[in-house]
């Protein structure tokens, strides 16, 4: 099993290209199931989760070709051979549930295993299922599988009110509604850029959608969808992660492809901590203003609030801030599993339920640490960049699910980091 060796060595300077968004691409790929015409995705990230979704779609009979080194995906679902998404593939990734809505909408039936993925508390699929039931689907959960069937004549437009904001449930309902009979209104819908990106792609395919980016999305069902070519939106979580690298280490880094509107709430916290963020012709330039970072309080919220997927990385920054910071996690439970590993490096962190209190220290110390999930793994790498001595991060298979060539991108800016094959 691979590990990452990091040596803290001061400032970073250079440029880092930001890839297409993993979470956007994982929703865009199942959209091919809505049409029998080709869908081409450009600016696709080259990640293990994308390969897992490729395997899942191919198991259903879809064709998926990876072109230009994986940056272009050519998909076609003109002849599905199966409507059963098996546990062996689905268990690897929670986004697998996103094949349910498209298959149900196009062909009227689907069998999908309950999903797996990151070990971050309870992430139930109830909201997905209730949305589809509102459109008339009959659902039966047995033997670890969701057995879904559309009513005669197909899914029907409906008013769907999400009791909680859910990106995945919004995506599943949005895709299903494009082929439903009549009008569907999604209320308390997720507003994330990945939702906007999916809606734009579906519109290119012929869907009639209004309101994406707001909490109310209206979809007028159509008889069929066609093909399209669509660029995947920039990955705002990768962007935010690499913005934190010069914030932690000092120096100045330009993030190519970065856009301020993708990370607005995050940038506000960086500014309060003493980090400069400037727009450039090619992206964003980030630098630490003067001296030690200042403590700030952070509360995770659905977009446009502070993203939960940047909470672990932000904690790494605040470990060496001047003063005491409070981080409140309001999206997922059990999402401070990185805290004990940061404590091994000398951080002062107290966790009580969904709140972590971080008292900044002047310096972290390198140590062997273990990644527990995707975002925790990169937070430990960031901490290692600012620590004295060597840090070895084990179980970095988590990292490869969401970050493309992390050691190459950081080393290009002067970081001493390398992968140790396991």
Swiss-Prot record:
GO terms for cellular component: cytoplasm. Cell wall formation. Adds enolpyruvyl to UDP-N-acetylglucosamine. It is found in: Cytoplasm. InterPro entries: Enolpyruvate_Tfrase_dom, Enolpyruvate_Tfrase_sf, MurA_subfamily, RNA3'P_cycl/enolpyr_Trfase_a/b, UDP_GlcNAc_COvinyl_MurA. It is an enzyme of class 2 (transferase). GO terms for molecular function: UDP-N-acetylglucosamine 1-carboxyvinyltransferase activity. The modification 2-(S-cysteinyl)pyruvic acid O-phosphothioketal is found at residue 118. The gene is murA. Its EC number is 2.5.1.7. Keywords: Cell cycle, Cell division, Cell shape, Cell wall biogenesis/degradation, Cytoplasm, Peptidoglycan synthesis, Pyruvate, Transferase. Pfam families: EPSP_synthase. Gene3D superfamilies: Enolpyruvate transferase domain. One of its GO terms (biological process) is cell division. Phosphoenolpyruvate binds at residues 22-23. UDP-N-acetyl-alpha-D-glucosamine binds at residues 94, 123-127, 309, 331. This is UDP-N-acetylglucosamine 1-carboxyvinyltransferase. Belongs to the EPSP synthase family. MurA subfamily. The active site is at 118 (proton donor). It comes from Cereibacter sphaeroides (strain KD131 / KCTC 12085) (Rhodobacter sphaeroides). CDD domains: UdpNAET. It catalyses: phosphoenolpyruvate + UDP-N-acetyl-alpha-D-glucosamine = UDP-N-acetyl-3-O-(1-carboxyvinyl)-alpha-D-glucosamine + phosphate. Its main location: cytoplasm. The keyword Heme does not apply. Pathway: Cell wall biogenesis; peptidoglycan biosynthesis.
């Amino acid at each position: 099993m691979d590990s990452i060796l990091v040596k803290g060595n001061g400032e970073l300077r250079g440029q880092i290209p930001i890839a297409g968004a993993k979470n956007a691409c994982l929703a865009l790929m199942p959209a091919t199931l809505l049409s029998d015409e080709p869908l081409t995705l450009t600016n696709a990230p080259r990640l293990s989760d994308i390969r897992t979704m490729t395997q899942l779609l191919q198991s259903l009979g879809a064709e998926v070709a990876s072109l230009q080194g994986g940056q272009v995906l050519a998909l076609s679902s003109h002849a599905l051979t199966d409507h059963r998404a098996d546990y062996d593939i689905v268990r690897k990734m929670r986004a697998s549930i996103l094949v349910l809505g498209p298959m149900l909408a196009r062909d009227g039936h689907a069998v999908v295993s309950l999903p797996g993925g990151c070990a971050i508390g309870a992430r139930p699929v109830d909201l997905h299922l209730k949305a589809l039931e509102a459109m008339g689907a009959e659902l039966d959960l047995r033997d670890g599988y969701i057995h879904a069937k559309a009513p005669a004549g197909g899914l029907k437009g409906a008013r769907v009110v999400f009791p909680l904001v859910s990106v995945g449930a919004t995506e599943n309902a949005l895709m299903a509604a494009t082929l439903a009979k009549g009008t569907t209104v999604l209320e308390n819908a997720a507003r994330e850029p990945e939702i906007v990106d999916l809606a734009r792609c579906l519109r290119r395919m012929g869907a009639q959608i209004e309101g994406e980016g707001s909490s109310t999305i209206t979809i007028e069902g159509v008889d069929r969808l066609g093909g399209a070519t669509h660029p995947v939106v920039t990955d705002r979580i990768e962007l935010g992660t690499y913005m934190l690298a010069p914030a932690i280490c000092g120096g100045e880094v330009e993030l190519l492809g970065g856009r301020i509107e993708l990370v607005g709430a995050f940038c506000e916290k960086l500014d309060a901590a003493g980090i400069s963020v400037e727009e450039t012709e090619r992206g964003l330039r980030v630098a630490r203003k003067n001296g030690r970072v200042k403590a700030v309080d952070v509360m995770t919220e659905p977009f446009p609030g502070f993203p939960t997927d940047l909470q672990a990385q932000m904690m790494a920054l605040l470990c060496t801030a001047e003063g005491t910071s409070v981080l409140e996690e309001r999206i997922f439970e059990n999402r401070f599993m990185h805290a004990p590993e940061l404590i091994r490096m000398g951080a002062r962190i107290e966790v009580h339920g969904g709140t972590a209190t971080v008292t900044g220290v002047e310096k972290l110390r390198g140590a062997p640490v273990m990644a527990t999930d995707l975002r925790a793994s990169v937070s430990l790498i960031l901490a290692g960049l600012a620590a004295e001595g060597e840090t070895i991060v084990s179980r970095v298979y988590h990292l490869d699910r969401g970050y493309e060539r992390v050691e190459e991108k950081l080393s290009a800016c002067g970081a001493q980091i390398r992968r140790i094959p396991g």
